UniProtKB/Swiss-Prot annotation:
Part of the 30S ribosomal subunit. Pfam families: Ribosomal_S15. InterPro entries: Ribosomal_uS15 (IPR000589), Ribosomal_uS15_bac-type (IPR005290), uS15_NS1_RNA-bd_sf (IPR009068). Gene3D superfamilies: S15/NS1, RNA-binding. It comes from the Eukaryota. PROSITE patterns: RIBOSOMAL_S15. It comes from Sorghum bicolor. The gene is rps15-A. CDD domains: Ribosomal_S15p_S13e. This is Small ribosomal subunit protein uS15c. NCBIfam families: S15_bact. GO terms for biological process: translation. The keyword Cell membrane does not apply. Its main location: plastid.
Length: 78
């Protein structure tokens, strides 16, 4: 459901958060197998920061869209 509606506007905050979430999950599973891959761990931390900043922006601008997005993507709220 999220994919279909987000492919229309790749610049939207929701699509960017969705994309970062997929990359984060993929990197997290990679790091479970390769615990000493520190460059990937650094990349994961960068992605987490970018996603966190986008979510903070969305929460400030439109709380309803923010709540809907974190529930769809199963992300914890800070």
């Amino acid at each position: 459901m999220v994919k279909e509606e987000k492919q229309e506007n790749r610049g939207s905050v929701e699509f960017q958060v969705f994309s970062f979430t997929n990359k984060i999950r993929r990197l997290a599973s990679h790091l479970e197998l390769h615990k000493k891959d520190f460059s990937s761990e650094r990349g994961l931390r960068r992605l987490l920061g970018k996603r966190q900043r986008l979510l903070a922006y969305l929460a400030k601008k439109n709380r309803v869209r923010y709540k809907k997005l974190i529930s769809q993507l199963d992300i914890r709220e800070k």
